[in-house]
Amino acid sequence: MATPAKKTGSKKSKRNVPNGVVHIQSTFNNTIVSITDTNGEVISWSSAGASGFKGARKGTPFAAQTAAEAAARRALDQGMRQIEVLVRGPGSGRETAIRALQVAGLEITLIRDVTPLPHNGCRRAKRRRV
């Protein structure tokens, strides 16, 4: 029987990135955490869905915490120590994700809310009737 061929794909090299920017996009349905270097190159990312949560549980604060921990762990492996945090969106996982980054061992130097606010742009969605 033939032996399976070894995969020789290009493996991403581990860079030493001491400081970066964490983008937290928190919606009502999911939380996405992307960690970039200062130029905007993505170093690690995670989301509530990628962390194993499905459906309505993706929008919970605990799911946001788990996603932030996973992204922070991968960033720490690449040598990241100091971060700036940019938070976008109205979701429930905003504060929990920031707290999880701090507990993971990253030093937060700045927290900024960059939620886009319309100057009376598009019409809002109709109100839900349950």
Curated annotation (Swiss-Prot):
Question: What UniProt keywords apply to this chain's record, in alphabetical order?
Answer: Ribonucleoprotein, Ribosomal protein, RNA-binding, rRNA-binding
The Swiss-Prot or TrEMBL record describes its family as follows: Belongs to the universal ribosomal protein uS11 family.
Q: Name one GO biological process term.
A: translation
The task this protein performs is described as: Located on the platform of the 30S subunit, it bridges several disparate RNA helices of the 16S rRNA. Forms part of the Shine-Dalgarno cleft in the 70S ribosome.
Could you tell me which Gene3D superfamilies the record lists for this protein?
A: Ribosomal protein S11
Q: What is this protein called?
A: Small ribosomal subunit protein uS11
Under Pfam families, the record lists: Ribosomal_S11
